[in-house]
Amino acid sequence: MRMTAHITHKIRIYPNQTQEAWLRKACGAARFVYNWALTDWAKQYEEFKQEHTKPKPSRVGLANQLNKLKISDPSLKWLTETSDQPAQNALQDLDAAFKRFFKGQASYPSLKKAKAKRSFRQYIRSKIFINGKLKLASLKSPIKMAEQWRFAPDAKFLFLTVSEQNNKWYAAITAEIPDCALPKGLDSETV
């Protein structure tokens, strides 16, 4: 039996100094937006509980607030120096965290610490490999990789997560691989 599978391939990347500065800024933007949104969400929710005429907090509302804030507050200009995706995905992550919390599946979301693992996620909308290097949206030059993508060449790339661990950078690329053969003895119901 054949089916579609999702697979993630984690590859070590070697950014130059300019690229590393951009990656650090993107990680910082994701963490800043997540923490800002968590604080604002809590404030808006308290206002909503006390006065039901106030709107309930939402990801879309916070995204609109963030866009206005980036324009009106000069100290947040640095958020526009990377792709918008890390910030938007941080809002999606917070939205998912609150949904799990309200369903009783997780504890209340907590602030992300600066010393914790740095990472951000981007959806892949265009070609990401150029001459054996990784091309990120909004980054001018591609990043050198330790190895090539080793799975199906016809894979549909979905998103990638860039992370830093112990001063080493990694890109975890998630793709959809069509028409995969299941191991013998398994069927789509078992998987």
Where are these regions (language model features)?
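Nucleic-acid substrate recognition interfaces
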Residues: 1-191
